[in-house]
Structures are given as structure tokens and as C-alpha cells.
Amino acid sequence: MYKEPFQPTYEYALECDKHDELKDFQTEFYKKEGTIYLDGNSLGLLSKRAEKSLLTLLDSWKEYGIDGWTEGEHPWFFLSEKLGKLTAPLIGALPEETIVTGSTTTNIHQVIATFYEPKGIRTKILADELTFPSDIYALQSQIRLKGLDPEEHLVRVKSRDGRTLSEEDIIHAMEDDIALILLPSVLYRSGQILDMKRLTTEAHKRGIHIGFDLCHSIGSIPHHFKDWDVDFAVWCNYKYLNAGPGSVAGLYVNSKHFNRLPGLSGWFSSRKDKQFDMEHTLTAADHAGAYQIGTPHVLSTAPLIGSLEIFKDAGIERLREKSLHITRYMLNLIGHELKDFEFTIGNPLEDEKRGGHIYLEHAEAARICKALKANGVIPDFRAPNGVRLAPVALYNTYEEVWKSVQILKKIMKNEEYKQFENKREVVA
């Protein structure tokens, strides 16, 4: 259990760390001495188990050559399916509904190509104006491939406050001309969690297929897709799942849709026992593996093996419990220590609506992020005025949160941020 009630003292932070049930996992990760890493919502840290699994697959290449496809501890030919089964509990899906493949964007193209079937008056895709740009680019592209104009056929739900979305507004936008819906599970700026169960129920009442981009939720919050009856989902594995930069992504398709041919078919869409028959007629796999396209990127998949072992040991419910407590602690500390420095908290305060990161707004956000980095705290900046801070349950401590807020207070009090330009770097 985590210590209550909140106190702003250093001793309280240490006491919370003492009671942290997950504290032993911190030694699993490579943490740079003198640095407080609060950017795990953008790129998770390397774990020793992820490193080991990568080296294991390199060794299998060295040892077996071409036979690595069927030999060794993790035969490559079945690796995507194996990791899909290990990922399934994190989203509350059946093992056969989940596959590790592609990138987030290519997987969006896959699910949209599969589920977007404009007919009659149902020709539009519903998204939102706060979603990640890549999702919009892919949706626009898929609409154009149908010979339609994205300006007419892509509907984006407006935000009332520029930070969050109203679920009532989303439901109101589910009109008779909507053919498909793609929404974020957690908004990448504000960290707002959308009620996926409610939105799925409302979409299905209207005969609309609905899916979610889980990039900012998977590995951070529990999901219950089998209960919620979500149609499809996509995600990356390099944020909270700590599988490394450019790691292979994930895709979920509800088993009730396994009769659908993939919109984008390829070499690995095939049933395994038929693949090397080399026929020109595809016999698609009868599980989520059908929605793969090309050969698995084995070395970019490898770190996920070790990372998912950690998640199995830690448990997503325990991770969520700590995440809620440590983010609430950080919000309380920010409110206590930074009230004189014109910060606005941009994420929901309610536990059930808040994901795994804190979102602060400030007119000097870009230069504040640079000053934090210069002081050994790693945040990230999101245009136009956002500072994201992610105390990750697996490897961040309450002491680190306390120190980072004190450093931020010092930066503001001494105006250290003024020595930096208030514009983002090439990579924010």
C-alpha cells in the first residue's frame, strides 16, 4: 500500500518509496546516474531482460542462420504470434486476437483498409481534432484511395477546451453518414482517458465499427476488449512497454471479424501450413496473424520478449495502482510548490480519466523543457505550450518526482529558462 495522506516533504517521498510494492523492478532498468527520466510516455527505458532477449535472438542468427526460422528458444517464424499471445492480457483480448507486427501507422492503414467500406450515405470516418497527426495522415490517405475527398469525408470532433474531448460530443457526431470510427484511448497531450466501453456500445447501437489507438494507454492502464467488444486497435510498443526505438508495433482484431480478408494482404497474412505452398491464392490465417503483411522484423521485435516478461511479473493492475498514486502525488506537489509560476494543469484530475503522464501548460514551455534537461530532468515538449512528465510505475521513484518538482521550482524562481530559446528542437 502507498502512504496517505499527501505531504510535500522529502521524507514523505522516501516513505512512499519504502512502501512501493513494485520497487524491486527499478533495478531491472538501465537508469543513468544523475538523471531523472520522466519521458517514458515517449520512449521507455531499456531493461536488462529486453537487452538479454535481443542478444538471444542475435545469437540465434549467429548459431542457426536460416534455420533460426524454426530452431532455437524463440523460432522467428512463430515469434509474432507468440508475442501477440503474451500481449493479449494487457488489453483483455483473446490470444488469437492480438499480433505483434508493423508500425502504428502501417497497422492503421491495415485496419482502415479492412474495415472502411463506404456505401450509400455511410462514407465518412469519424476521428477527433486532438489525435496524433499520423493517425489523421493515414485516414486522409485511405479516404483518398477510395476516390473520396478527406475534406468532406473525414469528420473531426472538436474539443471544447483545446485539451480534452467530450464523450457526449463524440456520440453526437456518430451520425448516419459515419462508416467507421478511430479514436485515441488516451490523448497524447492531456492524458485524458476516453471511455472506450461506452463509445463502443454507442457506435455499435448505430451499426458503426470502432477502433482505438492505444499508443498512450497500453502498458499503463488495464483494458477489457473482450468485454467491451471493440472492433480493432493498434499501438506502439516503445512507450510504456519499453521495447525500444522503432520496435515492432501491435494490432488487435476482434475474433468476430476473422472472416474478413485483410485489406492489405501479404506474405505473412497466410496460414502457416500453407505459406510455403507458394500458391497465388491467399489462404489467410484464421486469427489476427492474417493482418500481418511482410516478414517479421525479428531484431526489432526481440526486446519485447523480455519486456513482456516484466509486465507478466508486475501485473497491469498493480502498475495502474502505482501510476495513479504517483501521478496524483506529482499533481499535489506541483500544486503546492509551483502555484506562483503560472503553470496550468492540462490533464484531468479524476483518477478514472487520467492516463500515465502529467501535462503542464506554460507560455515558456519549450525553454522550460530545455532548462529541465540542463538540470538532469528529462521531460518532453508538445507544441504549442505543453510540458509532459511521466513518472513510470516500473522504474520511477517518489524521490525522483519530489526532486524533479524542486528542480522545476528552482528553474522558475531563478528564471533559468530565460537562457534558452522558446522554440522546440527538431525532435521535441
From Swiss-Prot:
Its cofactor is pyridoxal 5'-phosphate. It comes from the Bacteria. It holds the Pfam family KYNU_C. GO terms for molecular function: kynureninase activity; pyridoxal phosphate binding. Signal peptide: none annotated. Keywords: Hydrolase, Pyridine nucleotide biosynthesis, Pyridoxal phosphate. Pyridoxal 5'-phosphate binds at residues 104-105, 132-135, 213, 216, 238, 267, 295. It is an enzyme of class 3 (hydrolase). The modification N6-(pyridoxal phosphate)lysine is found at residue 239. The keyword Transferase does not apply. One of its GO terms (biological process) is quinolinate biosynthetic process. Catalyzes the cleavage of L-kynurenine (L-Kyn) and L-3-hydroxykynurenine (L-3OHKyn) into anthranilic acid (AA) and 3-hydroxyanthranilic acid (3-OHAA), respectively. PANTHER family: KYNURENINASE (PTHR14084:SF0). Homodimer. Belongs to the kynureninase family. This is Kynureninase. It comes from Bacillus cereus (strain ATCC 14579 / DSM 31 / CCUG 7414 / JCM 2152 / NBRC 15305 / NCIMB 9373 / NCTC 2599 / NRRL B-3711).
